Amino acid sequence: MATSPSTSGTAAFNLDLTEIVEEAFERIGSEVRTGYDLRSARRSLNIMFADWANRGINMWTMDSGVINLVQGQTTYALPADTVDLLDHVIRTQANSSSNQADLTITRISISTYATLPNKIQQGRPIQVWIQRLDSMTSPTTSMVASAVGATDTTITLTSVVGLPNTGFIQIDSETIFYSYVSGNQLGNCFRGQNNTTAATHNVGSLVNYQNLPSVTVWPTPDNAQQYQFVYWRMRRTQDAGGGVNVMDVPFRFIPCMIAGLAYYLGGKTADMQRLPMLKAQYDEAWELAAQEDHEKAAIRFVPRQMFIGSTY
Protein backbone atom coordinates (compact mmCIF):
# COMPACT_ATOMS: atom_id res chain seq x y z
CA MET A 1 0.00 0.00 0.00
CA ALA A 2 1.43 3.34 -1.02
CA THR A 3 2.06 5.86 1.73
CA SER A 4 0.94 9.45 1.37
CA PRO A 5 3.74 11.98 1.14
CA SER A 6 4.13 14.08 4.27
CA THR A 7 3.98 17.86 4.42
CA SER A 8 6.81 19.98 5.77
CA GLY A 9 5.12 20.56 9.10
CA THR A 10 6.32 24.17 9.10
CA ALA A 11 4.71 27.50 8.22
CA ALA A 12 7.61 29.91 8.58
CA PHE A 13 8.36 30.93 4.98
CA ASN A 14 9.92 34.37 4.71
CA LEU A 15 12.48 36.17 2.59
CA ASP A 16 15.39 38.35 3.64
CA LEU A 17 16.32 41.55 1.83
CA THR A 18 18.72 39.88 -0.59
CA GLU A 19 16.15 37.29 -1.68
CA ILE A 20 13.46 39.96 -2.10
CA VAL A 21 15.75 42.04 -4.30
CA GLU A 22 16.79 39.02 -6.37
CA GLU A 23 13.15 38.07 -7.02
CA ALA A 24 12.23 41.64 -7.97
CA PHE A 25 15.16 41.95 -10.39
CA GLU A 26 14.24 38.64 -12.02
CA ARG A 27 10.72 39.98 -12.64
CA ILE A 28 12.15 42.84 -14.69
CA GLY A 29 14.37 40.44 -16.65
CA SER A 30 17.61 41.32 -14.89
CA GLU A 31 19.74 40.27 -11.94
CA VAL A 32 21.67 41.87 -9.09
CA ARG A 33 25.16 42.51 -10.40
CA THR A 34 26.68 45.12 -8.13
CA GLY A 35 26.46 46.42 -4.60
CA TYR A 36 24.88 49.56 -6.00
CA ASP A 37 22.00 47.49 -7.40
CA LEU A 38 21.29 46.23 -3.89
CA ARG A 39 21.56 49.71 -2.39
CA SER A 40 19.24 51.14 -5.06
CA ALA A 41 16.67 48.40 -4.43
CA ARG A 42 16.81 48.94 -0.68
CA ARG A 43 16.21 52.66 -1.19
CA SER A 44 13.22 51.93 -3.44
CA LEU A 45 11.84 49.51 -0.86
CA ASN A 46 11.98 52.15 1.87
CA ILE A 47 10.28 54.68 -0.43
CA MET A 48 7.55 52.13 -1.15
CA PHE A 49 7.01 51.54 2.59
CA ALA A 50 6.54 55.31 2.99
CA ASP A 51 3.93 55.21 0.22
CA TRP A 52 2.11 52.38 1.99
CA ALA A 53 1.55 54.68 4.98
CA ASN A 54 -0.52 56.89 2.65
CA ARG A 55 -2.71 54.03 1.42
CA GLY A 56 -4.76 53.56 4.58
CA ILE A 57 -4.51 51.55 7.77
CA ASN A 58 -1.99 48.72 7.67
CA MET A 59 -3.15 46.39 10.41
CA TRP A 60 0.29 45.01 11.25
CA THR A 61 1.53 48.53 12.13
CA MET A 62 -1.11 49.06 14.80
CA ASP A 63 -0.14 49.10 18.47
CA SER A 64 -1.22 50.83 21.66
CA GLY A 65 0.34 53.09 24.24
CA VAL A 66 -0.34 54.90 27.49
CA ILE A 67 0.73 58.39 28.57
CA ASN A 68 0.47 59.40 32.22
CA LEU A 69 -0.93 62.93 32.30
CA VAL A 70 0.54 65.53 34.65
CA GLN A 71 -1.26 68.45 36.28
CA GLY A 72 -0.69 71.62 34.27
CA GLN A 73 0.99 69.97 31.25
CA THR A 74 -0.90 70.48 28.01
CA THR A 75 1.26 68.66 25.43
CA TYR A 76 2.79 65.16 25.44
CA ALA A 77 5.16 63.51 22.96
CA LEU A 78 4.18 60.44 20.96
CA PRO A 79 6.69 57.83 19.73
CA ALA A 80 8.78 59.24 16.89
CA ASP A 81 7.56 56.62 14.38
CA THR A 82 3.87 57.50 14.84
CA VAL A 83 1.93 58.01 11.60
CA ASP A 84 -1.44 58.81 13.18
CA LEU A 85 -3.71 57.91 16.08
CA LEU A 86 -6.65 55.66 15.31
CA ASP A 87 -8.52 55.88 18.61
CA HIS A 88 -8.03 57.25 22.10
CA VAL A 89 -9.66 57.51 25.53
CA ILE A 90 -9.00 59.11 28.90
CA ARG A 91 -8.55 56.46 31.59
CA THR A 92 -9.41 57.24 35.20
CA GLN A 93 -8.60 55.14 38.25
CA ALA A 94 -5.91 53.32 36.26
CA ASN A 95 -4.94 49.86 37.53
CA SER A 96 -7.93 49.78 39.87
CA SER A 97 -9.50 46.35 40.19
CA SER A 98 -13.03 47.75 40.27
CA ASN A 99 -13.27 51.47 39.40
CA GLN A 100 -11.16 51.90 36.25
CA ALA A 101 -13.06 53.70 33.49
CA ASP A 102 -12.18 54.64 29.90
CA LEU A 103 -13.93 57.87 28.93
CA THR A 104 -14.38 59.53 25.56
CA ILE A 105 -11.95 62.24 24.47
CA THR A 106 -12.86 63.93 21.18
CA ARG A 107 -10.32 64.71 18.48
CA ILE A 108 -10.39 68.36 17.37
CA SER A 109 -8.68 70.37 14.64
CA ILE A 110 -6.09 73.10 15.05
CA SER A 111 -8.81 75.64 14.19
CA THR A 112 -11.03 74.42 17.02
CA TYR A 113 -8.13 74.37 19.48
CA ALA A 114 -7.14 77.90 18.45
CA THR A 115 -10.60 79.21 19.37
CA LEU A 116 -10.53 77.83 22.92
CA PRO A 117 -10.47 80.99 25.07
CA ASN A 118 -8.62 79.53 28.08
CA LYS A 119 -6.17 76.84 27.03
CA ILE A 120 -4.71 76.39 30.53
CA GLN A 121 -8.08 75.78 32.20
CA GLN A 122 -7.76 72.65 34.34
CA GLY A 123 -10.09 69.69 34.59
CA ARG A 124 -10.59 66.22 33.12
CA PRO A 125 -9.45 66.34 29.47
CA ILE A 126 -12.32 65.94 27.01
CA GLN A 127 -10.68 67.10 23.75
CA VAL A 128 -7.37 66.34 22.04
CA TRP A 129 -5.49 68.01 19.20
CA ILE A 130 -3.08 65.63 17.47
CA GLN A 131 0.04 67.11 15.90
CA ARG A 132 1.38 64.83 13.16
CA LEU A 133 4.93 66.18 12.98
CA ASP A 134 8.08 64.78 11.36
CA SER A 135 10.12 63.79 14.47
CA MET A 136 13.13 65.76 13.25
CA THR A 137 15.73 67.01 15.75
CA SER A 138 17.32 70.26 14.59
CA PRO A 139 20.35 72.05 16.06
CA THR A 140 19.96 75.63 17.27
CA THR A 141 22.43 78.37 18.13
CA SER A 142 21.29 78.24 21.77
CA MET A 143 23.26 76.94 24.73
CA VAL A 144 22.51 76.59 28.43
CA ALA A 145 23.38 79.92 30.07
CA SER A 146 22.90 78.87 33.69
CA ALA A 147 23.41 75.41 35.22
CA VAL A 148 20.21 73.34 35.20
CA GLY A 149 19.26 71.00 38.03
CA ALA A 150 17.26 67.81 37.52
CA THR A 151 14.14 69.37 39.06
CA ASP A 152 14.37 72.91 37.66
CA THR A 153 11.29 74.11 35.81
CA THR A 154 12.85 77.30 34.42
CA ILE A 155 15.79 77.09 32.01
CA THR A 156 17.91 80.06 30.95
CA LEU A 157 19.47 79.96 27.48
CA THR A 158 21.95 82.19 25.69
CA SER A 159 19.34 82.79 22.98
CA VAL A 160 15.83 81.70 22.05
CA VAL A 161 16.12 82.63 18.38
CA GLY A 162 14.46 79.95 16.24
CA LEU A 163 12.50 78.39 19.11
CA PRO A 164 8.68 78.50 18.98
CA ASN A 165 6.64 79.82 21.90
CA THR A 166 6.10 76.30 23.22
CA GLY A 167 7.51 72.90 22.31
CA PHE A 168 10.17 70.29 22.95
CA ILE A 169 13.92 70.76 23.26
CA GLN A 170 16.74 68.28 23.77
CA ILE A 171 19.65 69.04 26.08
CA ASP A 172 22.25 66.27 26.18
CA SER A 173 20.06 63.13 26.18
CA GLU A 174 17.02 64.64 27.93
CA THR A 175 13.86 65.82 26.18
CA ILE A 176 12.10 68.74 27.88
CA PHE A 177 8.71 70.30 27.18
CA TYR A 178 8.49 74.04 27.86
CA SER A 179 5.19 75.91 28.11
CA TYR A 180 6.28 79.45 27.25
CA VAL A 181 9.22 81.73 26.47
CA SER A 182 10.00 84.85 28.50
CA GLY A 183 13.11 86.74 27.48
CA ASN A 184 15.86 84.12 27.27
CA GLN A 185 14.08 81.80 29.69
CA LEU A 186 11.92 78.75 29.03
CA GLY A 187 9.16 78.57 31.62
CA ASN A 188 6.95 75.89 33.19
CA CYS A 189 9.22 73.11 31.92
CA PHE A 190 8.27 69.46 32.28
CA ARG A 191 11.35 67.30 32.52
CA GLY A 192 12.24 63.81 31.28
CA GLN A 193 9.77 63.66 28.38
CA ASN A 194 9.59 61.03 25.62
CA ASN A 195 10.98 58.23 27.83
CA THR A 196 14.09 60.20 28.81
CA THR A 197 15.34 60.93 32.33
CA ALA A 198 15.56 64.33 33.98
CA ALA A 199 19.22 65.21 34.53
CA THR A 200 21.56 68.08 35.37
CA HIS A 201 23.01 70.14 32.51
CA ASN A 202 26.12 72.28 32.56
CA VAL A 203 26.60 75.78 31.23
CA GLY A 204 27.41 75.59 27.53
CA SER A 205 25.37 72.44 26.83
CA LEU A 206 23.93 72.57 23.31
CA VAL A 207 20.18 72.89 22.78
CA ASN A 208 18.35 71.08 19.97
CA TYR A 209 14.74 71.66 18.92
CA GLN A 210 12.61 68.51 18.54
CA ASN A 211 9.64 68.54 16.17
CA LEU A 212 7.97 65.55 17.83
CA PRO A 213 4.54 64.13 17.02
CA SER A 214 2.43 64.96 20.04
CA VAL A 215 -1.00 65.35 21.58
CA THR A 216 -2.36 68.49 23.23
CA VAL A 217 -5.27 67.90 25.61
CA TRP A 218 -7.95 70.27 26.87
CA PRO A 219 -8.77 71.06 29.58
CA THR A 220 -5.26 70.81 31.00
CA PRO A 221 -5.19 67.92 33.51
CA ASP A 222 -6.00 68.84 37.11
CA ASN A 223 -4.96 66.98 40.26
CA ALA A 224 -8.40 65.61 41.14
CA GLN A 225 -7.15 62.15 40.16
CA GLN A 226 -4.56 60.43 37.99
CA TYR A 227 -5.45 60.52 34.29
CA GLN A 228 -3.98 58.41 31.51
CA PHE A 229 -4.21 59.08 27.79
CA VAL A 230 -4.65 55.64 26.21
CA TYR A 231 -4.25 55.46 22.44
CA TRP A 232 -4.11 53.09 19.50
CA ARG A 233 -1.86 54.24 16.69
CA MET A 234 -0.50 53.40 13.26
CA ARG A 235 3.30 53.40 13.23
CA ARG A 236 5.77 53.51 10.38
CA THR A 237 6.85 50.26 8.73
CA GLN A 238 10.42 49.54 9.83
CA ASP A 239 13.27 50.26 7.41
CA ALA A 240 14.50 47.56 5.04
CA GLY A 241 17.81 47.30 6.88
CA GLY A 242 20.69 45.03 5.87
CA GLY A 243 20.84 42.00 3.62
CA VAL A 244 20.11 39.44 6.36
CA ASN A 245 17.02 41.24 7.69
CA VAL A 246 13.49 40.08 6.99
CA MET A 247 10.95 42.83 6.38
CA ASP A 248 8.47 44.28 8.87
CA VAL A 249 5.65 42.97 6.68
CA PRO A 250 3.27 40.01 7.25
CA PHE A 251 3.63 37.01 4.96
CA ARG A 252 0.36 37.90 3.20
CA PHE A 253 2.03 41.04 1.83
CA ILE A 254 5.18 39.34 0.50
CA PRO A 255 3.76 38.97 -3.07
CA CYS A 256 2.61 42.60 -3.01
CA MET A 257 5.96 43.80 -1.67
CA ILE A 258 7.93 42.02 -4.39
CA ALA A 259 5.55 43.14 -7.14
CA GLY A 260 5.83 46.71 -5.89
CA LEU A 261 9.62 46.61 -5.74
CA ALA A 262 9.75 45.18 -9.27
CA TYR A 263 7.58 48.09 -10.45
CA TYR A 264 9.81 50.64 -8.71
CA LEU A 265 12.95 49.04 -10.17
CA GLY A 266 11.30 48.84 -13.58
CA GLY A 267 10.99 52.61 -13.58
CA LYS A 268 14.77 52.87 -13.34
CA THR A 269 15.55 50.65 -16.31
CA ALA A 270 15.62 51.46 -20.00
CA ASP A 271 13.01 48.77 -20.82
CA MET A 272 9.85 50.82 -20.28
CA GLN A 273 7.70 48.33 -22.19
CA ARG A 274 7.47 46.18 -19.06
CA LEU A 275 6.32 49.06 -16.86
CA PRO A 276 2.53 48.87 -17.53
CA MET A 277 2.58 45.13 -16.86
CA LEU A 278 4.59 45.58 -13.65
CA LYS A 279 2.21 48.29 -12.45
CA ALA A 280 -0.82 46.12 -13.19
CA GLN A 281 0.72 43.23 -11.24
CA TYR A 282 1.52 45.54 -8.32
CA ASP A 283 -1.96 47.07 -8.26
CA GLU A 284 -3.59 43.63 -8.32
CA ALA A 285 -1.32 42.27 -5.58
CA TRP A 286 -1.96 45.34 -3.41
CA GLU A 287 -5.72 45.09 -3.88
CA LEU A 288 -5.76 41.42 -2.88
CA ALA A 289 -3.63 42.01 0.22
CA ALA A 290 -5.39 45.22 1.29
CA GLN A 291 -8.85 43.64 1.00
CA GLU A 292 -7.79 40.98 3.50
CA ASP A 293 -6.00 43.40 5.83
CA HIS A 294 -8.97 44.80 7.73
CA GLU A 295 -11.10 44.11 10.78
CA LYS A 296 -13.98 41.70 10.35
CA ALA A 297 -16.12 42.92 13.23
CA ALA A 298 -19.76 43.73 12.51
CA ILE A 299 -20.68 47.40 12.09
CA ARG A 300 -23.98 48.78 13.35
CA PHE A 301 -25.29 52.25 12.49
CA VAL A 302 -27.85 53.82 14.83
CA PRO A 303 -29.42 57.23 14.02
CA ARG A 304 -29.52 59.88 16.71
CA GLN A 305 -32.88 60.19 18.44
CA MET A 306 -33.09 63.85 17.39
CA PHE A 307 -33.24 62.84 13.70
CA ILE A 308 -35.89 60.12 14.01
CA GLY A 309 -39.15 61.35 12.51
CA SER A 310 -37.57 64.56 11.25
CA THR A 311 -38.93 66.02 8.02
CA TYR A 312 -35.54 67.41 7.01
Language-model-derived ranges and their functions:
Residues M1-S138, N208-Y312:
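Glycine-enriched, solvent-exposed interface loops adjoining structured elements
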Residues M59-Q71, Q100-T106, L133-N208:
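Autoprocessing Asn-cyclization modules and mimics
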